[in-house]
Curated annotation (Swiss-Prot):
Name under which the protein is recorded: Elongation factor Tu
Localization of this protein: Cytoplasm
Family: Belongs to the TRAFAC class translation factor GTPase superfamily. Classic translation factor GTPase family. EF-Tu/EF-1A subfamily.
Catalytic activities: GTP + H2O = GDP + phosphate + H(+)
Cross-referenced Pfam families: GTP_EFTU, GTP_EFTU_D2, GTP_EFTU_D3
Length: 396
């Protein structure tokens, strides 16, 4: 069968399946492609194709992730599914596969399990905006009261981690029934019901171009007679010639005006998200700007030194540390384009962190960095990556 070409005129959304091992995440992913393929919105991808996910590298960390894509009436989706629990942890922390929302899969036969809890917590920490729940394997539970009990448990767990537990849609069904065409109501119909809820409940993400301008500084040049040019890739938003911007991070915030934008040696009137540009700054000296700072829309981003983070620490096999670390560990934190030294404070009751652990910790940087929640970073020792993290909340 010829692959149907995806129309790119629908809004795009990135989602993924999360939940405990063997609760049916991969089966559900396969079932979604099967049911949506009936209306031409997907190409059916079988369980074993998804299960042997290829390895990818993100921030120096190897992660196995399977990607499928499909579309509903309203949206085009890119969907990620990971084979192992460790892959989920790494994926969510590194942001290798950005999630605008997630489908939490819970087996009705088992109810919430340790990884269910951990994935909900991770989703909260890394800032996944919305979850929809698929209560799977409902064909294995005969007692409707038991189903209600499991649903209640899931809602309580979601509320505990500050998701709106009483509002989140929970769809009861069976991925296997959908794959085997055995029970239309729990299979086919439940999958369509799930996708209707994903369409409606997961908010449409704001496109990078619509967000406030930000560009990490990669290099700085002085051009005689013209001034200082700063180069980098625009992360989000648009910058127009003549606009005022701020230079944020590493030192006191400065205001300046962009007097020129060039790309591939051509002068433009603006630069936008995704463009590699050179920005000419009025009255800014070569020594006033350095790599590691950002150019940003005034007031849109502030420099900070103290934050709470969720981090994954590489194993020895992944090229990480061979030994644990303790409170007051001082590695470098690599944000966007530069390393900054910081001091780690472990939570009360956590004696040490072993390679392979993921951990919530507090970090105090020795100089401020332009930062906001959800910003990703690498943890490095002498240029070698030993971990990855995400800003969960800012302290000061």
């Amino acid at each position: 069968m010829a692959k149907a070409k995806f129309e790119r005129n629908k809004p795009h959304c990135n989602i993924g399946t999360i939940g405990h091992v063997d609760h049916g995440k991969t089966s559900l992913t396969a079932a979604i492609t099967k049911i949506l393929a009936e209306t031409g919105g997907a190409t059916f991808t079988a369980y074993d194709q998804i299960d042997k996910a290829p390895e990818e590298k993100a921030r120096g960390i190897t992660i196995s992730t399977a990607h499928v894509e499909y579309e509903t009436k309203n949206r085009h989706y890119a969907h990620v599914d990971c084979p192992g629990h460790a892959d989920y942890v790494k994926n969510m922390i590194t942001g290798a596969a950005q999630m605008d929302g997630a489908i939490l899969v819970v087996s009705a036969a088992d109810g919430p399990m340790p990884q269910t809890r951990e994935h909900i917590l991770l989703a909260r920490q890394v800032g996944v905006p919305a979850l929809v729940v698929f209560l799977n394997k409902c064909d294995m539970v005969d007692d409707p009261e038991l189903l209600e009990l499991v649903e209640l448990e899931v809602r309580e767990l979601l509320s505990k981690y500050e998701f709106p537990g009483d509002k989140i849609p929970i769809i009861k069904g069976s991925a296997l029934a959908a794959l085997e065409d055995s029970d239309k109501k729990l299979g086919h119909d439940a999958i369509l019901e799930l996708m209707r809820n994903v369409d409606e409940y997961i908010p449409q993400p704001e496109r990078p171009i619509d967000q406030p301008f930000l560009m990490p500084v990669e290099d700085v040049f002085s051009i005689s007679g013209r001034g200082t040019v700063v180069t980098g890739r625009v992360e989000r938003g648009i910058v127009k010639v003549g606009e005022e911007i701020e230079i944020v991070g590493l030192r006191a915030t400065q205001k300046t005006t962009v007097t020129g934008v060039e790309m591939f040696r051509k002068l433009l009137d603006q630069g936008q998200a995704g463009d590699n540009i050179g920005a000419l700054l009025r009255g800014t000296k070569r020594e006033d700007v350095e790599r590691g700072q950002v150019l940003a829309k005034p007031g849109s981003v502030k420099p900070h030194t103290k934050f709470k983070a969720e981090a994954y620490i590489l194993t020895k096999e992944e090229g990480g540390r061979h030994t644990p670390f303790f409170t007051n560990y001082r590695p470098q934190f690599y944000f966007r384009t530069t390393d900054v030294t910081g001091v780690v404070h472990l939570p009360e009751g956590t004696e040490m962190v072993m390679p392979g652990d993921n951990i919530a910790m507090e970090v105090h940087l020795i100089v401020p960095i332009a930062m906001e929640e959800k910003l990703r970073f690498a943890i490095r020792e002498g240029g070698r990556t030993v971990g990855a993290g995400v800003v969960a909340s800012i302290i000061e």
